C-alpha cells in the first residue's frame, strides 16, 4: 500500500477501507446508481436572493427526477443527528428508475428557464489554448455575443471524454503517472475563473453537463481519463453555491467510493495544485459540511434522513486533501486550515463514543477524520474522557472501601502528593511510584510542614518547581541546545531510568489535569511520543521509535544537521576528503565512546555512493537508538497516565500544544479577560499598563507572560483560560512589580506616570526567572 493511500486519516485508523479491485467489479453497477437529485426547497418561487436563476435550475433537476418523492421530502422534518451509516461503500441503494440512460436535453427544461437552442458544437482537433480562450472571452464581453464561449463550455463539460479532450495537454497521450495529471492547469484555472462571470445560461449548461456525466453508465474500473475528469470538476467554483450542493454531493460520493489505487493518483495530483486553489478546495468542503449540519435555510436541502451519505463522502474527500497536504514539505496549507469550528458545537462525546464502540467499520463518526476536529474540541474530548476515568476510578475506590466495611475517606478520591521542598524530586518519585494505581485521580499537592489547601495553586507550583529542577543542566537528564532553544534527552547510560519515567508521568498529569508546562522539547519528541499512540499489549514491542529525517535533526541540533547537509551536497571525493567511516563518537562523563552505525561500520568508509545511508543511520542513531531506554521510560510514564484512545485523535503538534500551550499571543484578548483586585479597568495606572504592554515588541510580551504565569505560552482555550489578575500593591512606587505565578497574578504598585511604569515593568520582567521577584 502506498504512503499516500495509508495516510487518509492521520492520528486514527483508516476511516474507510477501500474495496479490492476484484470485489469492486461485481458491485460496480449498483454502486454508481445515483440517488434522486432532489432538493427540499426546489419549489417554484423559492427566494434565493441573487442566485435565483441557479435555484431555478435546481428546480428543473427535481422536476426531471421524482416529483412525488420531492414532495414527500419537503414534508419531512430535518434532523441534525446523523443516522446510522456503516461507511461510504455501504451507501443506500438507489432506485433504478432514477438512472437516465439518455442525455437530458434543453427541451426538458421548464419553459421559464429554457435557453435558445445551440447547434451541436464540437471541439477542434487541437485543444484550445489559454490565449484562445481569453481572446474569445474578451470578444464576448465587448460584443455581448457569447455564442463561441457558450459552445466551448457546453461541449467541454458535456462528458468525461470531452473534459479530457478540452483540458489535456495532449489529447492523444495517456499521462498515466502520478506525477503528471496531463492537464493544462492554466487553462483549467482560466475557464473556472471566468465561469461565474458568464451569463446564467452558460452556467446552467455547465451544471447540466456535469449531471449528464455523473449519470452515465459505468462498467468496470475507472480509467485515468475519468480520474482527470473528477479532478477537474472538483475545482468548479459553482459548488460554492448552496443550490448546487445536490450535484456536488454526487460528485463527492463518486470520488469517495473510488478504489485505493485511484485515490493514490488523485492525492498526488492534488498536491500539485497551487496553494490558493488547494485552500479553496478545503474551504469549499468544510463549508459544505457545516451548512449540511447547520443550514441557514433548511428548505434549500433535502432532509438529512434522505442524504446520510453527504457528510461521509465529503469527509473522505477531505481525507484525500489532507493526505496530499501531508506529502508536501512545507505543507500547502497549515494543518489548522482543515479544522472545522462548526464541529465544536455538536455532541463531541457522542461522536467519540460512537468511534470507540464501532471503530471505522460501522457508523460514521467525525473522530474517524480527526484532522477536521479543532484542538479546542479535542481538548474537550480528552478532558471529559479523563474526568470520566477519574470518576470511575474514584467510585471504585469508594465501593471497595465500603465493601470492606471501612469508613470512606474523601482523600481516597484524589491523588494526594505529600512532598518536601528540600527533597522534591525523590519525594515526588516515591509518591508516584507508591500511588501508581491512583494516577488517574484528581491531583492534589501538599508541601510537608506548610499550611495551605490546594485549590490549584500548590499543584501548579509543584509542577513548576519540579520541572525547573529536573531540567537544570546540573541534573544531567537533559541537554539544552542553545541553537534550537530546546532540551533533548541525555544519551548517558545508567542503571535506573525511573526519573525519565517521572518526567513522562508529569507530562501526562499536566494533560490530564489541564495544566500548561514550561517545557521545550522539539517537535520530533512528540512524534516519538505517539509512536505508537496506544501502548502495545506485547511488552517486547519497541516504543518511542519513529521514522526520522535530517529535518527532524535540524530541530534539535541545527549545526550538526547543517554539516550533514553539506556532506550530502559535497561535489568532491567524500571518501578521500572526509576520511569518515560508519562509526560515530560520543562523550559520556568525560570518556569518548565509539558506536558503529551498522555491523563492521568502523571498517566501512563513507563515500559519494553511500553518504545518504550514512546520514540516515547517523540521524536515526542520535534521535532513536542512542536514547532508546531513556525515551522508552519517558513514553511509558506519559502513557501510564494518558492511556486513552483519545490520543489517537492528536497530531504531534497538538500534543505539544496540550502540554506546553500555544505560542500565538493575543494581548488584546488578555486585556479583555483580565480581572482586577484593588483597581478598576478605568484607573490611570491600569490604562498606563495596557498602553505600555500593547506597545511592547513580541519578545517583551512573552517575557511578561512568563513572569506572571510561569510560561510564555497560551493554554488551548486562549488567554481567557489564564484567569489573569492584576492586584493593587499598596507599596512605594519605587518597588518593582511582583508576580505570583501559581495564581497568574501580577501585583502592581500605583505608578503615577507611564514612563515610570514602563521602566519598572521592563526591569521586573527582564531580570526574573520562573516566579518573578518576591
UniProtKB/Swiss-Prot annotation:
E3 ubiquitin-protein ligase which accepts ubiquitin from an E2 ubiquitin-conjugating enzyme in the form of a thioester and then directly transfers the ubiquitin to targeted substrates. It comes from Mus musculus. Pathway: Protein modification; protein ubiquitination. The modification Phosphoserine is found at residue 9. One of its GO terms (biological process) is protein polyubiquitination. Its EC number is 2.3.2.26. One of its GO terms (molecular function) is ubiquitin protein ligase activity. Residues 1-51 are annotated as: Disordered. PANTHER family: HECT-TYPE E3 UBIQUITIN TRANSFERASE (PTHR45700:SF9), UBIQUITIN-PROTEIN LIGASE E3C (PTHR45700). The gene is Hectd2. The active site is at 742 (glycyl thioester intermediate). Residues 435-774 form the HECT domain. It is an enzyme of class 2 (transferase). Keywords: Phosphoprotein, Transferase, Ubl conjugation pathway. It catalyses: S-ubiquitinyl-[E2 ubiquitin-conjugating enzyme]-L-cysteine + [acceptor protein]-L-lysine = [E2 ubiquitin-conjugating enzyme]-L-cysteine + N(6)-ubiquitinyl-[acceptor protein]-L-lysine. This is Probable E3 ubiquitin-protein ligase HECTD2. Residues 21-34 have a biased composition (Basic and acidic residues).
Amino acid at each position: 500500500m502506498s504512503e499516500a493511500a495509508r495516510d487518509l486519516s492521520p492520528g486514527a485508523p483508516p476511516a474507510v477501507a477501500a474495496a479490492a479491485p476484484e470485489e469492486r467489479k461485481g458491485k460496480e453497477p449498483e454502486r454508481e446508481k445515483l440517488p434522486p437529485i432532489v432538493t427540499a426547497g426546489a419549489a417554484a418561487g423559492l427566494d434565493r436572493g441573487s442566485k435565483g436563476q441557479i435555484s431555478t435550475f435546481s428546480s428543473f433537476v427535481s422536476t426531471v427526477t421524482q416529483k412525488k418523492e420531492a414532495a414527500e421530502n419537503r414534508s419531512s422534518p430535518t434532523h441534525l443527528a446523523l443516522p446510522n451509516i456503516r461507511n461510504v461503500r455501504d451507501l443506500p441503494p438507489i432506485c433504478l428508475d432514477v438512472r437516465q440512460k439518455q442525455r437530458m436535453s434543453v427541451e426538458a427544461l421548464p419553459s421559464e428557464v429554457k435557453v435558445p437552442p445551440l447547434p451541436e458544437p464540437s471541439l477542434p482537433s487541437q485543444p484550445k489554448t489559454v490565449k484562445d480562450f481569453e481572446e474569445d472571452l474578451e470578444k464576448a464581453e465587448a460584443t455581448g455575443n457569447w455564442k463561441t464561449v457558450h459552445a466551448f463550455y457546453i461541449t467541454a463539460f458535456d462528458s468525461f471524454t470531452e473534459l479530457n479532450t478540452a483540458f489535456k495537454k495532449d489529447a492523444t497521450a495517456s499521462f498515466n503517472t502520478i506525477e503528471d495529471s496531463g492537464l493544462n492547469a492554466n487553462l483549467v484555472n482560466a475557464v473556472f475563473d471566468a465561469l461565474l462571470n458568464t451569463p446564467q445560461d452558460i452556467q446552467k449548461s455547465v451544471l447540466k453537463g456535469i449531471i449528464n456525466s455523473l449519470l452515465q453508465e459505468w462498467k468496470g474500473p475507472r480509467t485515468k481519463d475519468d480520474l482527470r475528469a473528477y479532478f477537474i470538476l472538483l475545482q468548479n467554483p459553482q459548488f460554492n453555491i448552496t443550490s448546487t450542493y445536490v450535484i456536488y454531493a454526487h460528485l463527492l460520493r463518486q470520488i469517495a467510493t473510488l478504489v485505493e489505487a485511484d485515490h493514490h493518483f488523485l492525492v498526488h495530483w492534488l498536491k500539485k495544485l497551487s496553494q490558493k486553489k488547494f485552500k479553496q478546495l478545503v474551504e469549499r468542503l468544510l463549508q459544505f459540511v457545516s451548512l449540511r449540519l447547520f443550514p441557514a435555510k433548511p428548505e434549500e436541502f433535502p432532509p438529512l434522513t434522505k442524504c446520510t451519505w453527504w457528510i461521509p463522502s465529503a469527509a473522505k474527500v477531505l481525507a484525500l486533501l489532507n493526505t496530499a497536504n501531508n506529502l508536501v514539505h512545507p505543507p500547502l496549507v497549515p494543518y489548522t486550515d482543515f479544522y472545522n469550528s462548526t464541529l465544536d458545537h455538536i455532541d463531541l462525546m457522542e461522536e467519540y463514543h460512537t468511534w470507540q464502540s464501532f471503530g471505522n467499520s460501522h457508523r460514521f463518526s467525525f473522530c474517524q477524520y480527526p484532522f477536521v476536529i479543532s484542538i479546542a474540541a479535542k481538548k474537550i474530548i480528552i478532558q471529559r474522557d479523563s474526568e470520566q476515568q477519574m470518576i470511575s476510578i474514584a467510585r471504585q475506590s469508594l465501593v471497595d472501601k465500603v465493601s470492606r466495611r471501612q469508613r470512606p475517606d474523601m482523600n481516597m478520591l484524589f491523588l494526594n502528593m505529600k512532598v518536601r521542598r528540600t527533597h522534591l524530586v525523590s519525594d515526588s518519585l516515591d509518591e508516584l511510584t507508591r500511588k501508581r494505581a491512583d494516577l488517574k485521580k484528581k491531583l492534589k499537592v501538599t508541601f510537608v510542614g506548610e499550611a495551605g489547601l490546594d485549590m490549584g495553586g500548590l499543584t501548579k507550583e509543584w509542577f513548576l518547581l519540579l520541572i525547573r529542577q529536573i531540567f537544570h543542566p546540573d541534573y544531567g537528564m537533559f541537554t539544552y541546545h542553545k541553537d534550537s532553544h530546546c532540551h533533548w534527552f541525555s544519551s548517558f547510560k545508567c542503571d535506573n531510568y525511573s526519573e525519565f519515567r517521572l518526567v513522562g508521568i508529569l507530562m501526562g498529569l499536566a494533560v490530564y489535569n489541564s495544566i500548561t508546562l514550561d517545557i521545550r522539547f522539539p517537535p520530533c519528541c512528540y512524534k516519538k511520543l505517539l509512536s505508537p499512540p496506544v501502548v502495545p499489549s506485547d511488552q517486547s514491542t519497541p516504543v518511542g521509535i519513529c521514522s526520522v529525517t535530517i529535518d527532524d535533526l535540524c530541530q534539535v541540533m541545527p549545526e550538526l544537521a547543517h554539516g550533514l547537509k553539506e556532506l550530502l551536497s559535497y561535489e568532491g571525493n567524500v571518501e578521500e576528503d572526509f576520511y569518515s567511516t560508519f562509526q560515530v563518537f560520543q562523550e559520556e562523563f568525560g570518556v569518548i565512546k565509539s558506536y558503529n552505525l551498522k555491523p563492521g561500520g568502523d571498517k566501512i568508509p563513507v563515500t559519494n555512493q553511500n553518504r545518504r545511508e550514512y546520514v540516515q543511520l547517523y540521524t536515526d542513531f542520535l534521535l532513536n537508538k542512542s536514547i532508546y531506554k531513556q525515551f522508552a521510560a519517558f513514553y511509558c510514564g506519559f502513557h501510564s497516565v494518558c492511556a486513552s484512545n483519545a490520543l489517537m485523535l492528536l497530531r504531534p503538534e497538538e500534543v505539544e500544544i496540550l502540554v506546553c500551550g500555544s505560542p500565538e499571543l493575543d494581548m488584546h484578548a488578555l486585556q479583555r479577560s483580565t480581572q482586577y483586585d484593588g483597581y478598576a479597568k478605568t484607573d490611570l495606572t491600569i490604562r498606563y499598563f495596557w498602553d505600555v504592554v500593547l506597545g511592547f515588541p513580541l519578545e517583551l510580551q512573552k517575557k511578561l507572560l512568563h513572569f506572571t504565569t510561569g510560561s510564555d505560552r497560551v493554554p488551548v482555550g486562549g488567554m481567557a483560560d489564564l484567569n489573569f489578575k492584576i492586584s493593587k500593591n499598596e507599596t512605594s512606587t519605587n518597588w518593582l512589580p511582583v508576580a505570583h505565578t501559581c495564581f497568574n497574578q501580577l501585583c502592581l504598585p500605583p505608578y503615577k506616570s507611564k514612563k515610570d511604569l514602563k521602566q519598572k515593568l521592563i526591569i521586573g520582567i527582564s531580570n526574573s526567572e520562573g516566579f518573578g521577584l518576591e
